[in-house]
């Protein structure tokens, strides 16, 4: 998936039976994207990259930075245009003509028409394409089908954790593709991208970039930064030291995570333990750190408020100095309460002396960059990490004296920096979803703090004995 979205990769994984990753031209360097892409594709027979917004939409109207087009060129991929042809016939060919000529450096391998009225509609479209763009094949045309629609809500589509792709919907999707798309031609138009060695079996290593022709969300407004060095692997002595256990809440309430962040934690020596608060689970007593990702705690606020063992264990861990890192929904759970749109308040962990309130309108959306201004779980002052924020809630009843901010946040190209990254003791929480691939040292720092906490507990037990 191109862009920072969490939901689409989850749906990809449900359909493909394999993890899906985020490629991002703003949060991550060109080298990082290329390395991730090549690593994943080397283990597969076929890869598909879904675009973000429209093909050429990026952070502004003057360049391709952060766009699907940029990513296709970085990775050496042809593009399949997915065109919503509802209420269009010959005009669809004009649309494809403009997209295929807009950037001579991009190769459009074919077009797939969507939401058609019937077989006659597809024939009109094929005639228009053959008469004006014979070099761009029509790969197929999907008719309108209500059954395959995925429900939407605030923050986007319903997530994979809530199983919107039930078996009947999956079967219908497969049936439509097999019936209405020329899959052989699609594979024929795919390529072996640079730097990828095809697998010995199957058709391995081919890849296409699928891009919608029109945007559906506002583009980000920040300029891309220069490539960020990966920082290399952690020192050998760190990877061989006893592995600290990092508990990760993961279910429908906590479902916004980048798989890269998990891998970076493991590469730094962390041992991840996943648990589901909604299923009544809490993190193990032997945990040395806690990671609370974003998601939809507001939809499960009553359930979470009734999971008193979970909330009390968080309070106890925070009071005992355990490193706890939380993002967005995780921040909400660490507050005193979550207030719903109906005005109901549900008690949460109370680690921070403020609550959060849901809003009917979006509070924030866009790419962000944070600069550490104080030492914290993620590193020392001066470190820059990139991410994004997207939320419909805000902090309320804040007692500023009790909370320090570890970050300086820059959200837009010309906006003033503001404090973020709320810190109390060993707890760090923020509305920002950080991608540690932009600064792997952040993951290593968190693991180091967890390791130090584990050693401190061992010393305490030894003193007692």
Model-based region annotation:
Residues 1-75, 79, 83-110, 119-123:
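ATP-dependent carboxylate-amine ligase catalytic core
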Residues 48-50, 80-82, 112, 247, ...:
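Structural motif
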Residues 77, 136, 319-322:
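A short helix->loop->beta-strand "cap" motif at the edges of active sites that frequently abuts
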Residues 89-200:
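Internal gly/pro-rich beta-alpha loop/helix module
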Residues 244-308, 312-317:
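Phosphate-binding active sites in nucleotide-utilizing proteins
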Residues 297-377:
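Cysteine-nucleophile active-site neighborhood
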